[in-house]
Amino acid sequence: MADLFSTVQEKVAGKDVKIVFPEGLDERILEAVSKLAGNKVLNPIVIGNENEIQAKAKELNLTLGGVKIYDPHTYEGMEDLVQAFVERRKGKATEEQARKALLDENYFGTMLVYKGLADGLVSGAAHSTADTVRPALQIIKTKEGVKKTSGVFIMARGEEQYVFADCAINIAPDSQDLAEIAIESANTAKMFDIEPRVAMLSFSTKGSAKSDETEKVADAVKIAKEKAPELTLDGEFQFDAAFVPSVAEKKAPDSEIKGDANVFVFPSLEAGNIGYKIAQRLGNFEAVGPILQGLNMPVNDLSRGCNAEDVYNLALITAAQAL
């Protein structure tokens, strides 16, 4: 796991990447940003009252040299953000509503990213996923050609690294959604120097069972191959046929995956969430994420049970997405 983050840190160091942290009074956030700034890995921006944040840092024996602190209540560029917010929401928010919304740290931080004053955002240590993701969907929005954002985990154990998706966002993706998730997950894998070999998972392998659910995955494979013919991608697979070469030889002998997949696309959020937690708890894999993909600019959501190391690592990932 250290190798993964060492590689990412080398990639982002010296690139002058600015990451905003809306939860400026959270101890874990402050510990992480102090270390990020001290290591000169990236340039942290913390949101909140400067006096309160500095007092909290002093209480924790942390130095915040190199850390910018922006307070929505006193920020000089607020009017520009208000106008940009109103324009971006296209009739869904008045100036008064925009000013009120931008006093919320997550909306304020997201607007900094949208306006190019920061390159990415990390939140969620003290907020729900909805509080973190909603401003991003309203303001930053998804990339052209991408209808929905999705969430992946990098599953790492020693030298092994796999991508699991979607384990965080889309409850019941349809065929189009699954194809999109597969392509975006392959792009995320490349960001971590993982050459993607994508398996679309089901309880059937290449038509061994027939149902609406298996047909959904089979259709997703066709759509993904049409949209990204250069990708090594196939399905539908049971997990063993995607992961174990000897099983693949029996169940899917003609597939280009050959039991050597490293990007696994689950057919539903239910399956994906259960799958990554089984790998984490029974297989002793470290689960890094969820990493949100498909947005125009990177926004990532921490678990409220995170520690300072989790914050540090997700900030590195967010910075890498911004490059």
UniProtKB/Swiss-Prot annotation:
It is an enzyme of class 2 (transferase). One of its GO terms (biological process) is acetyl-CoA biosynthetic process. One of its GO terms (molecular function) is phosphate acetyltransferase activity. InterPro entries: P_Ac_Bu_trans (IPR012147), P_AcTrfase (IPR004614), P_AcTrfase_dom1 (IPR042113), P_AcTrfase_dom2 (IPR042112), Phos_Acetyltrans/Butyryltrans (IPR050500), PTA_PTB (IPR002505). Gene3D superfamilies: 3.40.50.10950, Isocitrate/Isopropylmalate dehydrogenase-like. It is found in: Cytoplasm. The keyword Ribosomal protein does not apply. Coiled coil: none annotated. SUPFAM superfamilies: Isocitrate/Isopropylmalate dehydrogenase-like. Pfam families: PTA_PTB. Pathway: Metabolic intermediate biosynthesis; acetyl-CoA biosynthesis; acetyl-CoA from acetate: step 2/2. Its main location: cytoplasm. Transmembrane segments: none annotated. GO terms for cellular component: cytoplasm. Belongs to the phosphate acetyltransferase and butyryltransferase family. This is Phosphate acetyltransferase. It comes from Bacillus subtilis (strain 168).
